[in-house]
Amino acid sequence: MKKKILIYAHYYAPDKASTGQILQDMAEGMQDDFDVTVICSVPSYTGKIDEKYKEKKIYEESLNGVKLYRVPVPEFSKASKKSRIKNLLAYYSQAKKVTKKVGPQDYIFTISQPPIMGGMLGVYGKKKIRTESGEHPKFIYCIQDYNPEQILATGYVKLKPVLKVAMSLDKKSCRKSDLVITVGRDLVDTLKNRFKGEEVPEHTMINNWIDEKQIYPLDPSEHGILEIKQKYGLENKYIIMYSGNIGLYYDLEGLIKVIEKFNGSKTPDGRDVVFAFVGAGSVLDKLTAYVKKHNMDSVVFIPYQDKDKLIYSLNAADVHWCVNAKGIKGVSCPSKFYGIAGVAKPVLAVLEKGSEVEMLINEIGCGKVSEPGDYKAVEDNIRWFIDNADSSELAEMGNRGHDYLVKNLTKDISIKKYTDVISKL
């Protein structure tokens, strides 16, 4: 008889949040070994909620064999702190209520989202739920990003007493867990630093992944790629793409000023250079306003792509950005790297030295990296990618990244690691 695992997931399919996609892959990939239940919010990543989910009730569903409890949350604006916090608190409160309905569980799995509350839900679940034999379930806390460190790095909340309480709560979640899993070597260092002079909680590191059966290199003549290029005016262009959350943690407001210097640029083989931003987030309006004000015809904004079209938008680029703001090293790990490697494209990275993905890019040799805030180095790297647009070196970089991914960072490899460490608890 399979053991039971409960997963707390603020976002889950069809929401396009990267953490939601990771947890969907995990939930569905673990079904050979576990009976999986997920507590998540109704689809709401964009801030809007479909009419069919607006009744204030719990929605019980099944998706690809995974049992879901979707809890009601209010709509929100990504630009409004108050409405975002209200949304997060609603999910936290409703998820606690549903916890009492899920029945016996052998394992509780949660990630570090929503900030602080993700870990607290795991602690709550371990306390309230029992196994079939009446014992407390094992609690696995997967830290995708550290808070309050991330909040502090971005200045999203500046009240020190609030941050002190938040740190205390998240350290408690780590202590109460039976296993902490981080997604980068630098995040392991942060865990050790958090507990300097204390007993460090049991922990391991497992990289995130990409589903190599859904995201893989395509021939540029593929219909889906041509369709996207035609739709957004990208035909015969040299495309430097940012794909993902256009939010607080990436210094995009600084990078757009560097990009402005390349307005109207061409490659040696005569193609116009275009900077494409694919996605949405709290900084999008500021970027679009800046681009409009400065007449930056070389910048194009494209909405989030459905999961079945993501392969085409990622393949449409010649080069991909992978960026984090200063202070994010050891705090968060940009999952977009795995998608870039998945489609065998070179990486234009802005990452701190010693961060997991910076180390991977340099170890593999699949891109150019500069430090956050070093805009001259960013400018030099952009220029290098433009000057070498017709060079075979770009394809070689992309292929090195893809080869490494296929051998080390596929969905099946990483999920087997999760299954193995959880089963041993």
Describe these PLM feature segments.
Residues 1-61, 262:
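N-terminal subdomain of nucleotide-sugar transferases
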Residues 270-272, 278-279, 284-309:
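Nucleotide-activated donor-binding/catalytic signature segment of Leloir-type glycosyltransferases, i.e.
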Residues 250, 299, 306-312, 320-341, ...:
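Nucleotide-sugar-dependent
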Residues 42, 186, 206-209:
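Carbohydrate-associated surface elements
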Residues 54-57, 216-233:
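A short helix/loop element that forms part of the nucleotide-sugar donor recognition site in Leloir-type
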Residues 234-250, 256-259:
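Conserved donor-binding/catalytic core segment of Leloir-type glycosyltransferases
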Residues 117, 124-128, 161-182:
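Membrane-proximal helix-turn-helix segments that form the acceptor-binding/catalytic region
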